[in-house]
């Protein structure tokens, strides 16, 4: 195989370069790695979020990932679609990371400190079709900021958002189980 001049990188071929294999690197996908770990250590603790009173085994975590992945797919999100997560460290963030990988979606990690202009730019730049966010964190009122950017949300059916400032965004998913116009929970 031809190499790029001055490097050990191949021209064409695989989309990655495989270096030293000592110790051997896993070539498993994230979903396959989760499935293998659940099969090997299913009843052992996997996820602990004390602040949210969550303690899941590998089997429980894998089942929750499957449930969320199925939900994202049921929304019509397909391989390559972008899903934003605008959140501090919470179990929903971890769940989203694995569920988007399971479906083949691209998880877009949005900085929890972003304000209106930064959020608008990020969502439009990467073309998020969905965003998952809590109501608020510290002094940031996430859902209020989304409502400012997309006032159409108040009258939209979930999944039918047609916001002038966020033209690709269709789904707003609220982390808390509180019914909110235009949003899923």
Show which residues each predicted segment covers.
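Flexible, non-catalytic linker and terminal segments flanking ANL/adenylate-forming cores
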Residues: 1-28
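Structural core segment of the AMP-binding/adenylate-forming
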Residues: 75, 103-185
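AMP-dependent adenylate-forming
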Residues: 9-11, 33-57, 176-180
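A short, structure-level motif marking secondary-structure boundaries and short turns
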Residues: 18-20, 53-54, 80-82, 103-105
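Short, flexible loop segments at the rims of nucleotide/cofactor-binding pockets, characterized by
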Residues: 22-25, 60, 108-111
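Short, histidine-centered active-site or binding-site loop motifs used for metal coordination
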Residues: 15-18, 50-53, 127
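Conserved AMP-binding/adenylate-forming core of the ANL superfamily
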Residues: 26, 35, 46-98, 115-120
């Amino acid at each position: 195989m031809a190499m790029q001049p001055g490097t050990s990188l191949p021209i064409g071929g695989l989309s990655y370069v495989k270096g030293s294999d000592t110790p051997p690197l896993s070539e498993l996908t994230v979903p396959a790695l989760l499935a293998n770990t659940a099969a090997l250590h299913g009843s052992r603790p996997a996820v602990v979020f004390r602040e949210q009173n969550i303690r899941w085994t590998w089997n429980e975590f894998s089942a929750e990932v499957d449930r969320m992945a199925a939900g994202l797919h049921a929304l019509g999100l397909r391989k390559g679609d972008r899903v934003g997560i605008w959140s501090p460290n919470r179990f929903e963030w971890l769940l989203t990371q694995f569920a988007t990988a399971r479906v083949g979606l691209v998880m877009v990690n949005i900085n929890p400190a972003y304000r209106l202009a930064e959020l608008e730019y990020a969502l439009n730049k990467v073309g998020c079709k969905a965003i998952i966010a809590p109501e608020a964190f510290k002094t940031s009122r996430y859902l209020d900021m989304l409502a400012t950017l997309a006032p159409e949300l108040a009258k939209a059916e979930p999944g039918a958002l047609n916001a002038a400032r966020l033209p690709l965004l269709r789904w707003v998913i609220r982390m808390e189980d509180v019914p909110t116009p235009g949003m899923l929970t």
